[in-house]
Amino acid sequence: MSQLRPAVFLVLLLTLITGLLYPLLTTTLAQWMFPQQANGSLLLEQGSVRGSAPIGQSFSRADYFQGRPSATSDRPYNPLASSGSNLAGSNPALDQAVSQRVAALRAANPQAGQQVPVDLVTASASGLDPQISPQAAYWQADRIAAARRLPREVVKRLIDENTTTPMPAFLGEPAVNVLALNLALDALQR
């Protein structure tokens, strides 16, 4: 009995700390310090949720920028099935998939240069990457400009406005969030 009392006390104390106090503290701090991120980094358009900034979406229409291919298994950009393709660089299946993606992109973007940016044909490690390089966005600019009947310079300006550079710069490369860029295109034509 003398050993049971401290054991029960510790179980109750740790349950209180880890089950109530710690979650309340971290939630309160997150809401105070990072409210946008703590609530899912949601991107809104006219009061409606259009997506979450850190999760990519599938865009197939000619008047929208396309992101990186998704490696999620059942449907593109499914956050519940996040994974990479796990295909080695020497795997013939990866070579075939990339070749098919290059052919499809060249067919959809006949006015673009011959060199297809690598991030448009390879999936990210998570399969959910929402960003592409500015070069990949510029590569698609002619198609977007033609489909939306906009001057190419307007499309390039939108790409520049939606390009983010990490601070400090040595922590990564400039990137463009595809969903944010497509929402900016929609807002421009309202």
Swiss-Prot record:
UniProt subcellular location: Cell inner membrane
Transmembrane segments: 6-26
Superkingdom of this protein's organism: Bacteria
Chief location: membrane
Molecular functions (GO terms): ATP binding; P-type potassium transmembrane transporter activity
Keywords attached to this entry: ATP-binding, Cell inner membrane, Cell membrane, Ion transport, Membrane, Nucleotide-binding, Potassium, Potassium transport, Transmembrane, Transmembrane helix, Transport
Any one cellular-component term (Gene Ontology): plasma membrane
One Pfam family from the record: KdpC
Chain intervals for the UniProt region annotation (Disordered): 67-88
Topology class, membrane: Single-pass membrane protein
Polar residues composition bias: residue spans: 69-88
Family to which the UniProt record says this protein belongs: Belongs to the KdpC family.
Subunit: The system is composed of three essential subunits: KdpA, KdpB and KdpC.
Task of the protein: Part of the high-affinity ATP-driven potassium transport (or Kdp) system, which catalyzes the hydrolysis of ATP coupled with the electrogenic transport of potassium into the cytoplasm. This subunit acts as a catalytic chaperone that increases the ATP-binding affinity of the ATP-hydrolyzing subunit KdpB by the formation of a transient KdpB/KdpC/ATP ternary complex.
Name of the protein: Potassium-transporting ATPase KdpC subunit
Organism of provenance: Erwinia tasmaniensis (strain DSM 17950 / CFBP 7177 / CIP 109463 / NCPPB 4357 / Et1/99)
Species classification: Bacteria, Pseudomonadati, Pseudomonadota, Gammaproteobacteria, Enterobacterales
